[in-house]
Amino acid sequence: MSPPPKSGYLSYYDAKGEDFDLSDQSCWQDKQKAVAKIIDSEKPDTMLDIGANTGWFSILAARRGINVIATDVDESSIDTLYLYAKQNHLQILPLIISFTNMTRQIFGVDCNDPEFRDRNFKAAPLYLPATERLQSDMVLCLGLLHHLVLGEGNSICHIFEVLSELSRKTLVMEYVDLEDELIVNEPSFFKRISDYKKNTYNIEVVINQGKRYFTSVETVASHPDTRTILVFNK
């Protein structure tokens, strides 16, 4: 099998200094330790890792016996994760799908062929939305919220609406503050950042929106200190 195509995101964890040895927790940062502790505490049977990249957290979960679905828009990262999971016999299903397409469904078209003329292909979708197909006990949304809001212009409310449909019980989300180094130093990645100020994009706003769809929330320290792990439960 030929190697996956290369992309700038293939070395994402390495570039951030977060390509840690999964078997050596002593080198992990607060983020990795926190997520591992949450997984061990919640004990989900299934997990959806959105924006998984090459799947560090997907692999972490799969090694704990969890059935994982990992999604990303980067083909190279997903191909790499697929090969790793296959070679190491891990229960990970890597899929190329964007957050925007999580709610997409496809219907058939009318057909004039006599055999199909009386059938209504628009009565039910041929392709169910991911919000129905990929529902999992736990959903990971790490390092993604700020891209969806500040980069793509999705409303925080809409993001939670989609994530609550995907999550049967627990949502683990990483909040990234406007003062985070990557946001400050790479404004070109966040084309809608001018739409937000500190009073419209902050951790309190995110938590309050999340409480509309989840009954409880816990905050956990991440790394660096401009980031916080939010654990929502239904």
Where are each of the predicted segments found?
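Conserved alpha-helix/loop element of class I SAM-dependent methyltransferases that forms part
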Residues: 26-43
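Conserved SAM-binding motif I beta-strand of class I
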Residues: 67-72
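Conserved beta-strand signature within the Rossmann-like core of class I S-adenosyl-L-methionine
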Residues: 165-177
